[in-house]
Amino acid sequence: MDRRRMPLWALLLLWSPCTFSLPTRTATFERIPLKKMPSVREILEERGVDMTRLSAEWGVFTKRPSLTNLTSPVVLTNYLNTQYYGEIGIGTPPQTFKVIFDTGSANLWVPSTKCSRLYLACGIHSLYESSDSSSYMENGSDFTIHYGSGRVKGFLSQDSVTVGGITVTQTFGEVTELPLIPFMLAKFDGVLGMGFPAQAVGGVTPVFDHILSQGVLKEEVFSVYYNRGSHLLGGEVVLGGSDPQHYQGNFHYVSISKTDSWQITMKGVSVGSSTLLCEEGCAVVVDTGSSFISAPTSSLKLIMQALGAKEKRIEEYVVNCSQVPTLPDISFDLGGRAYTLSSTDYVLQYPNRRDKLCTLALHAMDIPPPTGPVWVLGATFIRKFYTEFDRHNNRIGFALAR
């Protein structure tokens, strides 16, 4: 395959990508190993990049609907903070790509060899080459997803896609325009949306729906485990069931509150013993593609006030690291049960930071109606609570991770 080589300056700039374990197959369900890598934000923080200036110049890298799309994808994932990636194959023979498994979207896309050399980010990622695949079929329809001030743009193609040992024929995006930020520093190549068909740009049937149509899974569910440790073995996605080795007790299920979205209703947010928000109910999406917990700005300010946190710069609230052991718990009422995060769950400590400040893994995100306002429970929450997404019963299950 004629893949683009990473320029020498890029090799010096970036850390080397990590090698992924191959998926292992069982008789009842499929496992996709995940690895945890430094997020783009962490890389920039360690290099002393001013995130305030970066945000002003490049915008917030949160996906929003394509202006040319007739559907309305949920506006969720902030890929600037994403850390967990798995491996899939596209084509015959398979071409390997590292992707985010993202419940906040429904499309699969990867960079293409047809990406212009003007887009430097394409040069450091694995690129799909259709001529190397005997199972490729041309589609050619335009494909666009907007990200703040940038966009991911290309065209649709069809080929065999292998996920966790299961192969389906899939329409996906070949990306030919890839923004420099955040993808120049991102360790993942593309995104595999695990959302519902109504969220898909271009009316494409999502990968998981194609898998369900084969009837090969024991159950019409998938589950996500994110390791809380700092090592690279970051967790796993299980198709068709869940893995009791990674959770304790039983699942508590909450029905989805919005058709065709992994959205549920939250009936309270407490800091310490005080319920501050959402007693009348708030919409919340459980999003595997987001690293942090996101809330409307007005709600986040109340939480930060209760925690005594200060806004250091755009999208970053901090506390003195010496305060972390004394910070109160934050609890989320989901389906009549409190899911509690301690300060060690929601505070990030960067070892190389010199100002002795710790960052809170909560961000502001304001989404206008009709989609919003909405909260997002990302990896900060999922690391504590093993999560099962049940398509058959339209519900999400939570169990304490271990």
Swiss-Prot record:
Q: Which residues form the active site?
A: D102, D287
Name any one Pfam family assigned in the record: A1_Propeptide
Mind listing the GO molecular function terms for this protein? aspartic-type endopeptidase activity; endopeptidase activity; insulin-like growth factor receptor binding
Q: Where in the cell is it found?
A: Secreted; Membrane
Residues bearing glycans: N69, N139, N320
Which tissues express it? Kidney.
Self-association state and partner proteins as the record states: Interacts with ATP6AP2.
Explain the purpose of this protein. Answer: Renin is a highly specific endopeptidase, whose only known function is to generate angiotensin I from angiotensinogen in the plasma, initiating a cascade of reactions that produce an elevation of blood pressure and increased sodium retention by the kidney.
Protein known as: Renin-1
Naturally occurring in which organism (per UniProt): Mus musculus (Mouse)
